[in-house]
UniProtKB/Swiss-Prot annotation:
The lineage of its organism: Eukaryota, Metazoa, Chordata, Craniata, Vertebrata. It is a multi-pass membrane protein. GO terms for biological process: adenylate cyclase-activating G protein-coupled receptor signaling pathway; angiogenesis; cell migration involved in gastrulation; chemotaxis; G protein-coupled receptor signaling pathway; heart development; mesodermal cell migration; negative regulation of angiogenesis. The keyword Glycoprotein applies. It comes from Danio rerio. Residues 48-61, 118-139, 204-238, 292-362 are cytoplasmic. PANTHER family: G-PROTEIN COUPLED RECEPTOR. It comes from the Eukaryota. The chain crosses the membrane at residues 26-47, 62-83, 96-117, 140-161, 176-203, 239-259, 271-291. This is Sphingosine 1-phosphate receptor 1. Belongs to the G-protein coupled receptor 1 family.
Length: 362
């Protein structure tokens, strides 16, 4: 047993006698099963993107990076559970930092990937075109930056930002972490959350504004249509799903960590239930593949085809009409009367903003 870890756990009230915690509890087994599901679904998403040449585009690379980070979250959370309980006191401080730091890296990479997707979608809406050509290097540089920042963020405690020499500043949730570090991470994640909310709100506002302008133009030409408002409502539903899921999974953990910083040692009993809040954040890694990939008709079709035949998927050349509430087609609402060529300022390129990707076909 490592005396330093035991002292910190005892000081924060988390110390457990080894003989009282001999093995996995029922909730830990449930968490591991959920992690296995997370790993499986994200592996399938990665295989779908890898096997489908149509998905070898910047936006799908971001989706793939999100799946990779979520897959890693499932793996490291499983390892975290197996190394917890009585096994905690068998770890050296460095091993403990790697156990917890790997969780921070995986979850940070997942959150940063969500931000990267929101930024890419927003840029696409501003420029009204996709970055399909000549931008692969930029995309991979951005993905590399995501992982670099996540690794630095997760590695700060093992580099020295910890409370080994100042026990009074120790976190209750993570007894070797300094409260200042917990506050820093919570602030970073909260800023990212706000940025994602703002970006999706702007995406909706941009689409809504352009749809209204086109409706007014059509009404003036005697060609009124309610398709634009229907598509705007579809996008609004999608944005609400994306943001609600993200906030519901992450906000409780953010609040708990803020309580951890504010509370004195042994005063907040809710801090000893942190595993449930962390599990909820990890659950977001199970929801992301459903929200960001399977709501796309093309990805869902490729996904199912791969499961059925296990061979390289070759989707059809054209994207089908998106389902209501899952995808939003700007040009289909903006150009529903496209055969009439009296609106030259709008490109014939079709841009689909799904709940997790933006694709185009010409």
């Amino acid at each position: 047993m490592d005396d330093l870890i035991a002292r910190h756990y005892n000081f924060t009230g988390k110390f457990r006698k080894v003989h009282k915690d001999p093995g996995l509890k029922a909730d830990s087994v449930v968490f591991i099963i959920v992690c296995c599901f997370i790993i499986l679904e994200n592996v399938l998403v990665l295989l779908t993107i890898w096997r489908t040449k149509k998905f070898h585009k910047p936006m799908y690379y971001f989706i793939g990076n999100l799946a990779l980070s979520d897959l890693l979250a499932g793996v490291v959370y499983t390892a975290n559970i197996l190394l917890s309980g009585a096994n905690t006191y068998k770890l050296t401080p460095t091993q403990w930092f790697f156990r917890e730091g790997s969780m921070f890296v995986a979850l940070a990479a997942s959150v940063f990937s969500l931000l990267a997707i929101a930024i890419e979608r927003h840029l696409t809406m501003l420029k009204m075109k996709l970055h399909n050509n000549g931008k692969t290097c930029r995309v991979f540089m951005l993905i590399s930056t995501v992982w670099f920042i996540a690794a630095i963020l997760g590695g700060l405690p093992v580099m020295g930002w910890n409370c080994i020499d100042s026990m009074n500043n120790c976190s209750t949730v993570l007894p070797l972490y300094h409260k200042a570090y917990i506050l820093f991470c919570t602030t970073v994640f909260s800023v990212i959350l706000m940025a994602i909310v703002i970006l999706y709100a702007r995406i909706y506002a941009l689409v809504r504004t352009r749809s209204r302008k086109l409706v007014f133009r059509k009404v003036a030409n005697g060609r009124g249509s309610n398709k634009s408002s229907e598509k705007s409502m579809a996008l609004l539903k999608t944005v609400i799903i994306v943001l609600s899921c993200f906030i519901a999974c992450w906000a409780p953990l953010f609040i708990l960590l803020l309580l951890d910083v504010a509370c004195q040692t042994l005063t907040c009993s809710i801090l000893y239930k942190a595993e449930w809040f962390l599990a909820l954040a990890v659950l977001n890694s199970a929801m992301n593949p459903l929200i960001y990939t399977l709501t796309s008709n093309e990805m869902r079709r490729a996904f199912i085809k791969m499961l059925n035949c296990g061979v390289c998927v070759q989707p059809s050349g054209k994207f089908s009409r998106p389902i209501m509430g899952a995808e939003f087609s700007r040009s289909k609402s903006d150009n529903s009367s496209h055969p009439n060529k009296d609106e030259p300022e709008y490109s014939p390129r079709e841009t689909i903003v799904s709940s997790g990707n933006i694709t185009s076909s010409s």
